[in-house]
Amino acid sequence: MVDFKVVLSDPKTGLSYKIDAAGAAAGALLGKKIGTEVDGAPFGMSGYKITITGGSDKTGTPARPDLPGNGRRGLLISDGFGFNATHNGERRRKSQRGNEIAADFVQVNAKITVYGEKPVTEIFAAAAE
C-alpha cells in the first residue's frame, strides 16, 4: 500500500499538523481530487471534515487543481502553481501533476472545513506523546 505525508492546516489558528497516512488512511485519499471533502475518521479525527487543497509527488512536482487526471504533464505556463515569472510576459514549460491523488504522491495538503467535538490541539497532543 502507499504512504502519504498529510499536511493538515487549521484555518482558525493558522497552525499546521503533519499526519503520516498509511493503510486505510492513505486509501481514503487515493483517487480523490483537489477540492474534495474527505471524512477525518481514518486520520483519527472523528467528526471532522477535511478538504484536499494540493500535493506533490516524489520529485516535488506540484499538483494543479485545474488539470484533470493523475499524470505528469509539461505545460507552458505564465504564472501560478510551480512558477513565478521574473520578466513581464515570460512563459516557461514546467512539469505539473493532475488534480487526482495517485500512488506516487508523497505529500498531500489539506485543511479542516468542519470541526468535531474534540479540539485539534488535544488530538495532536495525544499523538505527540
UniProtKB/Swiss-Prot annotation:
Keywords: Ribonucleoprotein, Ribosomal protein. Pfam families: Ribosomal_S6e. GO terms for molecular function: structural constituent of ribosome. GO terms for biological process: translation. GO terms for cellular component: ribonucleoprotein complex; ribosome. PANTHER family: 40S RIBOSOMAL PROTEIN S6. Belongs to the eukaryotic ribosomal protein eS6 family. This is Small ribosomal subunit protein eS6. The lineage of its organism: Archaea, Methanobacteriati, Methanobacteriota, Stenosarchaea group, Methanomicrobia. The gene is rps6e.
